[in-house]
Every structure is written in structure tokens, then in C-alpha cells.
Amino acid sequence: DIVLTQSPASLAVSLGQRATISCKASQSVDYTGESYMNWYQQNPGQSPKLLIYAASNLESGIPARFSGSGSGTDFTLNIHPVEEEDAATYYCQQSNEDPYTFGGGTKLEIK
């Protein structure tokens, strides 16, 4: 299975500043020029919400302050400017190889 390592595990960012979350895969999640890395936001008691798919594509309805980048094994989620409603736990997920796997999560706190 592909192991995804997220960092940091928790993050406190001031309102209006930038939050940066990293995800490193144990092997490449690229295939035919596409990076099969996705990012989700989860609030307590709710299902995860897809933010970014294929490394850098913004899901419909998601604010443009969310952006994703990376390829191969190294990926980044940026949130800028951070808003209060962004306090949540964020997960990367690879969809290149079964079983699809998730990172351990990053809990974002807004100061």
C-alpha cells in the first residue's frame, strides 16, 4: 500500500495568513501525466469534503483561497487567506493505486 505522511500534524495560523500542509507519498502517485492526489477537509461529525483533486484542481464550489500543487511523491495544500471557517482537519488521499489511502491528517487551528 502507498503510505502518505502529512506534516505538520497540527498547525495554528493567524486569521488572514497562509496555512501550508505537506503530504509525502512512499511512491509516486503519477500516471500518464496526471498526479492522483486529492485533498479533503473534515469537520467533527461530518463526512470529508473534497477540496482539491488531481493535485491542483479545485472542486466545484470550493473557494479559490484553497490551492494544491506538487507531483510524484511531494504535494502541498495552501490556504490563503485563512478564514475562521477553515478550522478543521485536512487529509491528503492518493487515488492512483488500490487501496486508496489517506494521510494521518493535519488539524488546523485559527488564532
From Swiss-Prot:
GO biological process: adaptive immune response; immune response
Residue numbers spanned by region Framework-2: 39-53
GO cellular component, one term: immunoglobulin complex
Region (Complementarity-determining-2) location: 54-60
Renumbered residue ranges of the record's region Framework-1: 1-23
Region (Complementarity-determining-3): 93-101
Region (Complementarity-determining-1) location: 24-38
Disulfide bonds listed in the record: C23-C92
Region feature (Framework-4): 102-111
SMART domains reported in the protein's UniProt record: IG (SM00409), IGv (SM00406)
Classification via Gene3D superfamilies: Immunoglobulins (2.60.40.10)
This protein's UniProt keywords: Adaptive immunity, Disulfide bond, Immunity, Immunoglobulin
Pfam families per record: V-set
Region feature (Framework-3): 61-92
InterPro entries: Ig-like_dom (IPR007110), Ig-like_dom_sf (IPR036179), Ig-like_fold (IPR013783), Ig_sub (IPR003599), Ig_V-set (IPR013106), IgV_Light_Chain (IPR050150)
Misc. comment: This chain was isolated from a myeloma protein.
Protein name: Ig kappa chain V-III region CBPC 101
Species the sequence originates in: Mus musculus (Mouse)
